[in-house]
Curated annotation (Swiss-Prot):
Protein name (Swiss-Prot/TrEMBL): HTH-type transcriptional regulator EcpR
Any one Gene Ontology molecular-function term assigned to this protein's record: DNA binding
Protein task: Part of the ecpRABCDE operon, which encodes the E.coli common pilus (ECP). ECP is found in both commensal and pathogenic strains and plays a dual role in early-stage biofilm development and host cell recognition. Positively regulates the expression of the ecp operon.
Domain HTH luxR-type, first and last residues per copy: 138-196
Keywords in alphabetical order: Activator, Cytoplasm, DNA-binding, Transcription, Transcription regulation
Flavoprotein is among the record's keywords: no
Induction details: Negatively regulated by H-NS. Positively autoregulated. Also positively regulated by IHF.
UniProt DNA-binding residue ranges: 162-181
Gene Ontology cellular component annotations, sorted alphabetically: cytoplasm
Pfam families: GerE
SMART domains: HTH_LUXR (SM00421)
Keyword Acetylation found: no
Amino acid sequence: MTWQSDYSRDYEVKNHMECQNRSDKYIWSPHDAYFYKGLSELIVDIDRLIYLSLEKIRKDFVFINLSTDSLSEFINRDNEWLSAVKGKQVVLIAARKSEALANYWYYNSNIRGVVYAGLSRDIRKELAYVINGRFLRKDIKKDKITDREMEIIRMTAQGMQPKSIARIENCSVKTVYTHRRNAEAKLYSKIYKLVQ
């Protein structure tokens, strides 16, 4: 996603965070009309497969679209969005390139589960499975980003060069490149392409 200015970016993030905290906004990003409409209809459609009422889902859950368009925002501001959804049941909808990051946040945060949009034969069943609280660590389908890889991804997303990252992480530049290469293999993309 390309931002016009830092002000525009900050406003957009604050607007997203406000949307998440409002009780009537349980799907993020509400600005992605197709995702919002599609997921809203899908949740209503699977009503008979889930144990909770639709009202409880709207009140207690937040469904987050981890699309490649928004990954930069999630990576750079993961403490902010994770704080904003504290106390909610968070369900991550992960595209292929965001699966490893979704797994990282699942392991390191209070995430209810991950729906792998690219792998799912029946997304209705996958979504119901997660909403019903059945998603467990054994259900992780792909690799996860390690803590060290995540630090390097964050710093790369901020525009830092490998030498600077190596100094901060107290490691060699070669180690930075190794972690970056490993992360890129898990993300099916170069980091700089995901965080543009």
